[in-house]
Amino acid sequence: MTERRVPFSLLRGPSWDPFRDWYPHSRLFDQAFGLPRLPEEWSQWLGGSSWPGYVRPLPPAAIESPAVAAPAYSRALSRQLSSGVSEIRHTADRWRVSLDVNHFAPDELTVKTKDGVVEITGKHEERQDEHGYISRCFTRKYTLPPGVDPTQVSSSLSPEGTLTVEAPMPKLATQSNEITIPVTFESRAQLGGPEAAKSDETAAK
C-alpha cells in the first residue's frame, strides 16, 4: 500500500507563540515534548515520584511575586501533566485521535497513513538557548479501525496546540428482518396434470 501524507488545517493565528506559557527566565525541555519549570514545592513532590522530567528550584522573581507567578505556573503544571497525552474516541460515525503537541510548530509536525496505520511525527531541529543545544522528536502510531478509508483521514491543529486526526467510519448496510414472499398462482391443469386438463375440456363442451 502506498504511503499518504495527510494535510492538516491550521487553526492557529499568526501571533501564536509556542513559548507563551513559559517562565521568561527559563526555557528548558523535559521528556514530555519540552516544558517549563515548576515551583519548588511541586519540584520536591515530583522529584520524590516517578516523574521523568528535569526540575529545578523556583526562580527568585517568582518567590518575590508569588501572586503574579502562580497563574503562569498553574497553567504550566496543567500543560506538563497533559502534554504528549493522546485521547482516542471511537463512535459509530467517526474515529478520532486528539494529541497535545502545543510545543511544536506546525511545520514541525507530519501526519501520514500507510498500511492502515496513522503515523504522527514531530521534530525540533537542534537549537541553542541559554543552557546549550537542544533537539526533540516523537512518533505516535495509531491503527485505523477495519473498513476505514485512509484517503478520508483528515487532521487539524487548534490554537491551543491540540492536533486532531479523524476519519468517518464505514456505513454498514441496513439489514431488515422482513422478507416478502411472492405468491404463485397455479391453475387446475397444473394441479391435476394432463388428465385433469382433458376433464375440464369435456365439461366445457
Swiss-Prot record:
Effect in UniProt of substituting T151I: In HMND3; no effect on homodimerization; no effect on client proteins binding; no effect on function in chaperone-mediated protein folding
An annotated GO BP: regulation of translational initiation
Pfam families per the UniProt record, alphabetical: HSP20
Documented effect of changing S156Y: No effect on oligomerization; no effect on client proteins binding; no effect on function in chaperone-mediated protein folding
Phenotype for G84R: In HMND3; decreased homooligomerization; decreased heterooligomerization with HSPB6; no effect on phosphorylation by MAPKAPK2; decreased function in chaperone-mediated protein folding
Entry-annotated residues carrying Phosphothreonine: T174
Compartments where located: Cytoplasm; Nucleus; Cytoplasm, Cytoskeleton, Spindle
Disulphide linkage map: none
GO cellular component: axon cytoplasm; cornified envelope; cytoplasm; cytoskeleton; cytosol; extracellular exosome; extracellular space; focal adhesion
Subunit structure: Homooligomer. Homodimer; becomes monomeric upon activation. Heterooligomer; with HSPB6. Associates with alpha- and beta-tubulin. Interacts with TGFB1I1. Interacts with CRYAB. Interacts with HSPB8. Interacts with HSPBAP1.
Function, in words: Small heat shock protein which functions as a molecular chaperone probably maintaining denatured proteins in a folding-competent state. Plays a role in stress resistance and actin organization. Through its molecular chaperone activity may regulate numerous biological processes including the phosphorylation and the axonal transport of neurofilament proteins.
PANTHER family assigned: HEAT SHOCK PROTEIN BETA-1 (PTHR45640:SF7), HEAT SHOCK PROTEIN HSP-12.2-RELATED (PTHR45640)
Protein name from the UniProt record: Heat shock protein beta-1
Organism: Homo sapiens (Human)
Lineage: Eukaryota, Metazoa, Chordata, Craniata, Vertebrata
